[in-house]
């Protein structure tokens, strides 16, 4: 079935719908990963975005339950050159087209993804729309101009939980919070409050592997509630949207900084940046992929990282902050620590899923910071 992709600047591409009649809109971005499409589709950080995969064949190893990063697909649409309908892999349980259809997510193939990627790289990420029903490009362009811009959008409210929860295997289970606000933590584990702005499940697994007992909570979980829970440390997750819109969340982080060790990844990194006096700005086309080189300034080592963000943190002048990592493609900030408080954060994704594992030491480093704060 014929489908059109229109960008807000009038750029039009024609392709075929992967799963029948569809219409979807959002911010069009590109991802340079060769694999990992299931993890990308189910990453809540992609909420409100239409993802163009630069690798020409997507879906050849299918879909399985174990590679989910959340309970469902969060992207607005998937854009590929060719979608494989007959996957071949011993772990495959269903195909990519069926997976998209199950969650009613638009998909388009037959697109010149190289031309689209070049256009975005030169002109920046922009609003787009896919439709099988509207065949007049001019009508599509008029409609896409009504789509909200990513800047100024609080999409955390679309993906964050309303109440505390824990992860058992692949199941999200409501947490048993007592009437006094306390929680029964696991023995011999560090009690950890995780602010869930749209967390990926592999972050939780690696926190558990590092010796933490993570309890996921809503974005506006107060300092008083944290104290009542008995937690010893705070973790700020990834998530979608514009970090500058999360005023209340940033204020809560400022309060938490006075009492607890804190680590943040991706959106968590950006919110911590705001909390300690920095700002954020939108990147031209963002960093999305599993092959981004960064430099660890403490060791001098180069790490290949998994990334997914459209905003970056800036510190004009802050003597309390030490930059720990930079992006070697554009020299943007990739990580920082606070010189006097137990705070550390990275913009990239040390949990990978998908991507390389060069930066997974971040979780054990956070544990070391927490134990030092606790006097252990």
Swiss-Prot record:
SUPFAM superfamilies: Carbamoyl phosphate synthetase, small subunit N-terminal domain, Class I glutamine amidotransferase-like. The active site is at residues 266, 349, 351. InterPro entries: Anth_synth/Amidotransfase, CarbamoylP_synth_ssu, CarbamoylP_synth_ssu_N, CarbP_synth_ssu_N_sf, Class_I_gatase-like, CPSase_GATase1, GATASE. GO terms for biological process: 'de novo' pyrimidine nucleobase biosynthetic process; 'de novo' UMP biosynthetic process; glutamine metabolic process; L-arginine biosynthetic process. Residues 1-187 are annotated as: CPSase. The keyword Amino-acid biosynthesis applies. Keywords: Amino-acid biosynthesis, Arginine biosynthesis, ATP-binding, Glutamine amidotransferase, Ligase, Nucleotide-binding, Pyrimidine biosynthesis. GO terms for molecular function: ATP binding; carbamoyl-phosphate synthase (glutamine-hydrolyzing) activity; glutaminase activity. Pfam families: CPSase_sm_chain (PF00988), GATase (PF00117). It catalyses: hydrogencarbonate + L-glutamine + 2 ATP + H2O = carbamoyl phosphate + L-glutamate + 2 ADP + phosphate + 2 H(+). Its EC number is 6.3.5.5. Residues 189-376 form the Glutamine amidotransferase type-1 domain. Pathway: Amino-acid biosynthesis; L-arginine biosynthesis; carbamoyl phosphate from bicarbonate: step 1/1; Pyrimidine metabolism; UMP biosynthesis via de novo pathway; (S)-dihydroorotate from bicarbonate: step 1/3. L-glutamine binds at residues 45, 239, 241, 267, 270, 308, 310-311. HAMAP family: CPSase_S_chain. Belongs to the CarA family. Composed of two chains; the small (or glutamine) chain promotes the hydrolysis of glutamine to ammonia, which is used by the large (or ammonia) chain to synthesize carbamoyl phosphate. Tetramer of heterodimers (alpha,beta)4. Small subunit of the glutamine-dependent carbamoyl phosphate synthetase (CPSase). CPSase catalyzes the formation of carbamoyl phosphate from the ammonia moiety of glutamine, carbonate, and phosphate donated by ATP, constituting the first step of 2 biosynthetic pathways, one leading to arginine and/or urea and the other to pyrimidine nucleotides. The small subunit (glutamine amidotransferase) binds and cleaves glutamine to supply the large subunit with the substrate ammonia. This is Carbamoyl phosphate synthase small chain. It comes from Lawsonia intracellularis (strain PHE/MN1-00).
């Amino acid at each position: 079935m014929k489908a059109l992709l229109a960008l807000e600047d009038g750029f039009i591409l024609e392709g075929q719908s992967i799963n029948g009649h569809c219409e979807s809109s959002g911010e069009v971005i590109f991802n340079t990963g060769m694999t990992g499409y299931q993890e990308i589709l189910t990453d809540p950080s992609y909420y409100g975005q239409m993802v163009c995969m630069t690798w020409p064949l997507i879906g050849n190893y299918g879909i399985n339950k174990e590679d989910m990063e959340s309970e469902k697909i969060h992207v607005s649409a998937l854009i590929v050159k060719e979608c494989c309908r007959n996957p071949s892999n011993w772990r495959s349980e269903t195909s990519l087209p069926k997976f998209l259809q199950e969650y009613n997510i638009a998909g388009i193939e037959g697109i010149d993804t190289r031309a689209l990627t070049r256009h975005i790289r030169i002109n920046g990420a922009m609003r787009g729309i896919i439709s099988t029903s509207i065949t007049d490009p001019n009508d599509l362009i008029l409609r896409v101009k009504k789509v909200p811009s990513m800047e100024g959008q609080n999409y955390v409210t679309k993906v964050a939980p309303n109440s505390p929860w824990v992860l058992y295997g692949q199941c999200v289970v409501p947490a048993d919070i007592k009437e006094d606000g306390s929680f029964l933590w696991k023995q011999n584990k560090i009690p950890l409050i995780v602010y869930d702005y749209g967390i990926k499940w592999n972050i939780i697994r690696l926190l558990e592997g590092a010796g933490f007992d993570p309890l996921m909570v809503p974005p506006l979980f107060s300092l008083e509630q944290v104290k009542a829970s008995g937690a010893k440390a705070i973790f700020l997750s990834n998530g979608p949207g514009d970090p500058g819109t999360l005023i209340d969340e940033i204020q809560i982080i400022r309060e938490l900084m006075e009492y607890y060790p804190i680590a943040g990844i991706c959106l968590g990194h950006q919110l911590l940046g705001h909390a300690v006096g920095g700002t954020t700005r939108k990147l031209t086309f963002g960093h999305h992929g599993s092959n981004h080189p960064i430099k660890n300034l403490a060791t001098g080592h180069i790490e290949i990282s998994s990334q997914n963000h459209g905003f970056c943190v800036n510190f004009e002048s802050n003597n309390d902050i030490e930059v720990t990592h930079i992006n070697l493609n554009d020299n943007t900030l990739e990580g920082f620590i606070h010189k006097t408080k137990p705070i550390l954060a990275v913009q990239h994704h040390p949990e990978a899923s998908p991507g390389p594992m060069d930066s997974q030491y971040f979780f054990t480093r956070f544990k070391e910071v927490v134990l030092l704060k606790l006097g252990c």
